[in-house]
Amino acid sequence: MARKSLIQRERKRQKLEQKYHLIRRSLKKEISKTPSLSDKWKIHGKLQSPPRNSAPIRLHRRCFSTGRPRANYRDFGLSGHVLREMVHACLLPGATRSSW
């Protein structure tokens, strides 16, 4: 189980990303549309003004049940070992064990 502070920090980053998403997207469109390099540099400076944690690259997918940041399956929102336990216990409909 991940520490609660790490999970809360990740939620805070998600809220910041949602808040500044439209601003970042509009600035990126402006950069792609402007032909002059000096104007692009000015807009790029504006792009750096929002908080660092509002960037989407800083987000991590976390396991829904344990909060583990690694080995997450996007389809289920679970980490690998929790997914395996739930499949073995038949708690995930449609998921089957494979062996070859």
UniProtKB/Swiss-Prot annotation:
Record's superkingdom? Eukaryota
Q: Which UniProt keywords apply?
A: Chloroplast, Plastid, Ribonucleoprotein, Ribosomal protein, RNA-binding, rRNA-binding
- Provide a GO CC annotation, any one: small ribosomal subunit
Q: By its UniProt entry, which SUPFAM superfamilies does this protein fall under? A: Glucocorticoid receptor-like (DNA-binding domain) (SSF57716)
Q: What subcellular locations does the record give?
A: Plastid, Chloroplast
Q: Which PANTHER family match?
A: 30S RIBOSOMAL PROTEIN S14, SMALL RIBOSOMAL SUBUNIT PROTEIN US14M
**Protein's recorded name:** Small ribosomal subunit protein uS14c
Q: Please name the source species.
A: Amborella trichopoda
